[in-house]
């Protein structure tokens, strides 16, 4: 069967593209390697969402705001709240399980079709244009045709395998941003954590200029514990090449995402290197416990 639009990747970028195309009258197929939608936000513990605002002005709206509104309506997000570290203007905590359900519903309402547990295997090009892709799933290898193909793989796999010129890493040495394996902690005493930070602002110098904002903002997000981190590294209990703990509340009571591991000098587009990075990520997560 041929679709008007075939989208490789069911993360939020792929999902919003799918919804927009289907609402415009196109037949849409989303090819997703996991058993659920949401990409890094649901599969990798990435959160909160960021960059909806630049200062006071909201710069991301449309379908993404629809998703946030739907999450809020079901109690799965507090919506946009101030970033107490002020890296960005606002952050948007959310429930990953809730986002999976919202995306399922939105794509079905729009008339999109989804193939879960399906991997892109080959890109078939004719006269300089993609004519079809070969995918692999429980049915084996089979070909999917489309009028338009959208690369929402996250790594540009569709574009790269079609022969497009790709740029990866810094021009001078090819180095890319370190990889991270997030870990989620539950049962955290938020009031005790917040009280400690407010009682020792000198130990959380990145928060210090915004301590009043931190005092009134929920859920809690912070960066700190530099001294404890340094001591653990000196004692050989941590092998992580960063300086502190970075953590974000998800909005669920006592639940936090620690964005603190750091896997350097590995390549997420190389199968062997990526496999080693997975091992190192789990090792670093265990060190944090």
For the regions a language model picked out, list residue spans one by one.
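Beta1/beta-strand and adjacent pyrophosphate-binding region of the FAD-binding site
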Residues: 1-11
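Residues that mark the start of a beta-strand
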Residues: 4, 25-27, 147
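Membrane-embedded transmembrane-helix bundle of lipid-linked glycan/lipid transferases
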Residues: 6-8, 17-18, 22, 128
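Active-site-proximal beta-strand/loop segments in catalytic clefts of secreted hydrolases
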Residues: 8-10, 31-34, 152-153, 260-261
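N-terminal Rossmann-fold NAD(P) dinucleotide-binding loop
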Residues: 14
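Conserved N-terminal/central alpha/beta ligand/cofactor-binding core
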Residues: 20, 26-27, 32-126, 177-178
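Conserved beta-strand-loop-beta-strand element in the redox core of flavoprotein oxidoreductases
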Residues: 124-143
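Flavin (FAD/FMN)-binding glycine-rich loop and adjacent Rossmann-like elements that form
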Residues: 137, 141-148, 152-289
